[in-house]
Amino acid sequence: MVQKEVAERAVARDGKESILSIAVKAFGVPRIAAKVPAGAFRPAPKVDSAVLVVDNVSRRHFEHGGGLPKERIKHFFTVVHAGFAHKRKLLARNLEAAASKEKIKNAFDLFEISEKARAEDILAETWIALAEALR
């Protein structure tokens, strides 16, 4: 059980991803199982809660290709953190901390990512593929 707003960010169905939603979706399928109003607790907190469930938990996205899953997971989070490092900057510019401009351009072309894209605009599945392409 987490704050309702945290659960909603983890599920992120509004097309605006976050580091949290991408991290959760890389390992499973999140869903809100129940919402719990603040009044259900004594003393009542100032916020509502939600039961966040992550179905189909696995490392399947990181088990194929070269390298150990642990190394691939570390690289994935390095790329994601670089992408979200400066929220107002374009994604390509942020990713220069994790990969060369040439690799970034090739990956953007491959996945048809706009050069004007920001980190929050990229779906979790694309982040997984993008991180792999930037290895």
Where are the regions a protein language model picked out?
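Class I S-adenosyl-L-methionine
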Residues: 1-119, 129-135
